[in-house]
Amino acid sequence: MSDFFLQLGWNAFFAAQIRELPPGTLPARVLVQRRTNFLVAAHDGEYRATVTGRLRFLSGAQADLPVVGDWVLLRPIPGERTGSITAVLQRKTAVSRRAPGREDVEQVMAANIDVLFLVTGLDENYNLRRIERYLATAIRSSAQPVIVLNKVDLCSFVEEAIAEVRAVVGTAPIHTTNALSRESVGQLRAYLAPGVTAAFLGSSGVGKSTLINSLLGHEKFKTAEVREDSGRGRHTTSHRELVVLSSGGNLIDTPGMRELQLWGVDEEVSEVFDDIEELAQQCRFRDCRHDQEPGCAVRTSVEEGKLDPARLESYARLLRELDYHRRSTDIRARLTQKGKEKRMMRQYNRTIKRKRR
């Protein structure tokens, strides 16, 4: 493969999946996704592509379809810079959340990420509970989480904030940045070696697009002012896009989120809150809910001032959220199975009737 392909992130993990390419296809990486339209990069340049009907039909869920960062098989149309995506290669990592809306389904936001920059602003956006939520998502993705505390120039409690965040994120790296200063943002380049793909995850207005623009050295993504009345930013990134740095590495910008709803992070929540999990082992009752039960080591730690009650509430809230989604998924699966059995029975009855004629 070409040096460009290696810089894009192609490696032995993906090569092993296609030792023999299907005739007329070539590997490519998804750079941009706009609804059902994609821009992909192959060894000979960029193509505009759509998903074949067969791939869409065979995909078990929306999460199985291509997203930015995916490696896919492309069937180009001869003589044109367009083609069809016929397959999605197995993902090495994936950043997922529960899709917005009432339906309980997985939404993959980006695939094959090596480093996930979790960005929060040191302004009205600063929220330890949100960082906990993002960290659980990062751990589940299998990407390396890196905490970025942006807008350090607007903060008067930087050292205090770093100490608070350290207590929450454990050993994950923490960096403070001023997105408008290329020198300040330069510390993030250490994570962006050739072939490495990094994504930025954070709520609206934390400065993700400005950080990427500083790393690129020019304004690739639009930025907007944060509203002073609420501290919230407007969505300036309307789609996900992968860009290649001239110095090596790849960056993915994602639209800002009002809320990140967790998806399948049961074990990861335990890892994020390992201090509470360790205390829970000392509770008198194995099924202790850390509420009013006697002999609760967790409540004792709160009462002694050793455990932040807000952290305990965050832990309990995330567990309730996961339990709700788990039950919703089970109910939906049962209804789907029941519907499938009914259809099979109707087909069976029709077959029997035809044979009796």
Please state what every model-predicted region is.
Residues 1-128:
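N-terminal accessory targeting/assembly segments
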Residues 3-4, 24, 54, 60-71, ...:
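Helix-rich effector regions associated with P-loop NTPase G domains
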Residues 86, 175, 252:
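General small-molecule cofactor/ligand-binding pocket signal
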Residues 118, 147-149:
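Structural beta-sheet core signal
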Residues 129-139:
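Histidine-anchored nucleotide/phosphate-binding helix
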Residues 144, 151-206:
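Canonical P-loop GTPase G-domain recognition
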Residues 208-224:
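A conserved segment at the C-terminal end of the G1
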